[in-house]
């Protein structure tokens, strides 16, 4: 392919945007014999993992939390995030994995599982438990237009007693929600890392497949980038 300085810089910028290298440098060498250019890319790795632990105590009880986050799991750019928070009346836990280039197909895939429980049965007369799983994929469908498709499924159970409010008692029961998620991302930024010009339009919609409330969720965001000072 013909040498293109713009495409080279874009590739270097895409590597930097992965946020798993401390530095990324390029060297372009002219080969007079073959009349080609040799491109050497030098990278320096950086720590990409985080471990979090927390603990708190108060008049209404205590809480403990723990989390592990890794942006370059097994050296393949896979993002892993796992955390939980436990208190005297609640539990929140989540585990998610994202592979940005599944089997070198330029498609990202993700899966996430989470659980939330709130136990106020003795104090306010209600208890809720919600668990679910989400999975999907993202890929470039057309030039600079990225399409995301996913599915989320959640099961929720609500228990109440006579001390709960009338509204809470009316909500008692089991619920199953299943949604199809579609994302449309039109990305015309000049570069992903330290963007200085261009725009990005993002639209997301969650369509109910099975839902007691038949809630449809929409989200739209448009960002425009420019330099304040030259």
Which residue ranges define each predicted feature?
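Gram-negative/organellar outer-membrane beta-barrel architecture
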Residues: 2-202, 215, 225-227
């Amino acid at each position: 392919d013909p040498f293109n300085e713009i495409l080279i810089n874009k590739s270097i910028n895409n590597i930097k945007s992965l946020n798993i290298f401390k530095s990324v440098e390029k060297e372009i060498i002219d080969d007079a014999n073959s009349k080609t250019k040799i491109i050497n890319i030098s990278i320096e790795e950086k720590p990409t993992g985080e471990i979090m632990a927390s603990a708190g105590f108060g008049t209404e009880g205590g809480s403990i939390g723990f989390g592990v986050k890794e942006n370059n799991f097994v050296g393949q750019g896979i993002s892993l995030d796992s955390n939980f928070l436990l208190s005297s009346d609640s539990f929140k836990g989540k585990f998610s994995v994202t592979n940005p280039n599944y089997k070198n197909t330029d498609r990202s895939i993700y899966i996430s599982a989470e659980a939330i429980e709130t136990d106020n049965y003795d104090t306010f007369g209600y208890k809720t438990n919600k668990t679910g799983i989400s999975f999907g994929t993202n890929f470039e469908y057309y030039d600079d237009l990225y399409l995301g498709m996913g599915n989320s499924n959640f099961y929720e159970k609500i228990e109440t007693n006579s001390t709960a409010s009338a509204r809470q008692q009316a909500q008692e029961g089991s619920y199953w929600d299943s949604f199809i998620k579609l994302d449309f991302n039109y990305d015309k930024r000049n570069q992903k890392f330290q963007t200085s010009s261009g725009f990005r339009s993002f639209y997301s919609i969650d369509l109910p497949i099975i839902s007691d409330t038949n809630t449809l969720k929409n989200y739209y965001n448009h960002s425009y980038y420019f330099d304040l000072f030259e």
